[in-house]
Swiss-Prot record:
Active site: 93 (proton acceptor), 268 (nucleophile)
Organism: Pasteurella multocida (strain Pm70)
Function per UniProt: Catalyzes the base-exchange of a guanine (G) residue with the queuine precursor 7-aminomethyl-7-deazaguanine (PreQ1) at position 34 (anticodon wobble position) in tRNAs with GU(N) anticodons (tRNA-Asp, -Asn, -His and -Tyr). Catalysis occurs through a double-displacement mechanism. The nucleophile active site attacks the C1' of nucleotide 34 to detach the guanine base from the RNA, forming a covalent enzyme-RNA intermediate. The proton acceptor active site deprotonates the incoming PreQ1, allowing a nucleophilic attack on the C1' of the ribose to form the product.
Protein name as catalogued: Queuine tRNA-ribosyltransferase
Similarity remark: Belongs to the queuine tRNA-ribosyltransferase family.
Highest classification ranks of the organism: Bacteria, Pseudomonadati, Pseudomonadota, Gammaproteobacteria, Pasteurellales
Length: 385
């Protein structure tokens, strides 16, 4: 993988990721949003349908695919691309976040994490080396290092110990990745909680090891938005400009806009697909809660500005009807729309950066939703100063 940076507008960056795969050269235009395919599927969607929304790269979940179907089944198919029939780039997380979210079911040591398999209860072990081996078998185009996702809230001392162990695990991940002869990309993950001085140590340590890209982890885990914005404003300028920057597990449409404002290139989140199944649909001026009875006889499309299959063919009344009846098609049509909304948003962001009008786009984006534009935390600091 190589990253090409074309243009900047303020902190916002317009570029692309270029991948050489057996099927040819694939380009991912950035800033990019990656739909999440936890179990080797974007829920309810075929790969062709996902591609039709504009998606160029997907995220797979190492932890869940390791437990089911397992490495042996994956190897028999070739890799995850062959298994799920998506022959474009795939990024896989390392499994760290899922393991650490198990709470009392797991025990962390320097070697790795022992935990109880949530499917059958057996005790299993995941380490940086094992994570690299699983992701190698998955054939991931972008592999993520194994780290501890520092929880929120966390004391300075806990966040420091956690970040330092993640740095040691980053080196072990790098070493095993290289031993396997993996020719794909490996990303480091910056930790340190809400503490700027810890984030600085993490960035410097990871850059010293050397990675193909850098993710900002440990955000969107319950901290106030102001803290997320502050950390991004602090961390992004320290990441080498010629490497892609990935904000993990984020987020709402406004989070994507705010991430790009601060220099982020890549995002992933289950929100568009999960919210679709719960009847929360993203539109240009906010959210349509399709389960609301006011849509029972509404003959208008979800979003007149949207060009997705759902908006071109169906009314709000039909989507309300499908949801009310528990029809699977309702969840599918909702998912198509939400994924297309996210891809349209990213395309609009990219175009605005190209045309040197990103800040004007930000103003328009919030004006449509009737919300104020969040201030940059650095501006607040300078005002206070």
């Amino acid at each position: 993988m190589k990253y090409e940076l074309d243009k900047t507008d303020g902190n916002a960056r317009r570029g692309r990721l270029v991948f050489e795969r057996p099927q040819g050269t694939f380009t991912v235009e950035t800033p990019a949003f990656m739909p999440v395919g936890t179990y080797g599927t974007v829920k309810g969607m075929t790969p062709e349908e996902v591609r039709a929304t504009g998606a160029e790269i997907l995220l797979g979940n190492t932890f869940h695919l390791w437990l089911r179907p397992g490495q042996e089944v994956m190897r028999k198919h070739g890799d995850l691309h062959d298994f799920m029939q998506w022959h474009r780039p795939i990024l896989t997380d390392s499994g760290g976040f899922q393991v650490f979210s198990l709470g009392k079911l797991r025990k962390i040591t320097e070697e790795g994490v022992k935990f109880q398999n949530p499917i059958n209860g057996e005790r299993i072990f995941l380490s940086p080396e094992k994570s690299m081996e699983i992701q190698y078998d998955l054939g991931s185009d972008i592999v993520m290092i194994f780290d501890e996702c520092t929880p929120y809230p966390a004391t300075f001392d806990y966040a420091k110990k956690s970040m330092e162990m993640s740095l040691r695990w980053a080196k072990r991940s790098r070493d095993r990745f290289d031993e396997l002869g993996n020719k794909n990309a490996l990303f480091g993950i910056i930790q340190g909680g809400v503490y700027e001085e810890l984030r600085k140590v993490s960035v410097e340590g990871l850059v010293n090891i050397g990675f193909d890209g850098y993710a900002v982890g440990g955000l969107a885990v319950g901290e106030p938005k102001e803290d997320m914005h502050r950390i991004l404003e602090y961390v992004c300028p320290q990441i080498p400009a010629d490497k892609p920057r990935y904000l993990m597990g984020v987020g709402k449409p406004e989070d994507l806009v705010e991430g790009v404002r601060r220099g982020i290139d890549m995002f992933d989140c289950v929100m568009p697909t999960r919210n679709a199944r719960n009847g929360h649909l993203f539109v240009s001026d906010g959210i349509v809660k399709i389960r609301n009875a006011k849509y029972r006889e509404d003959t208008s499309p979800l979003d007149p500005e949207c060009d997705c299959y759902t908006c071109k063919h169906y009314t709000k009344a039909y989507l309300y009807h499908l949801d009310k009846c528990g029809e699977i098609l309702g969840a599918r049509l909702n998912t198509i729309h939400n994924l297309r909304y996210y891809q349209r948003l990213m395309a609009q962001i990219r175009q605005a950066i190209e045309e040197d009008r990103f800040e004007a786009f930000v103003q328009e984006f919030y004006a449509k939703m009737g919300k104020p534009v969040p201030p940059m935390q650095s501006e607040i600091k300078s005002d206070e100063g």
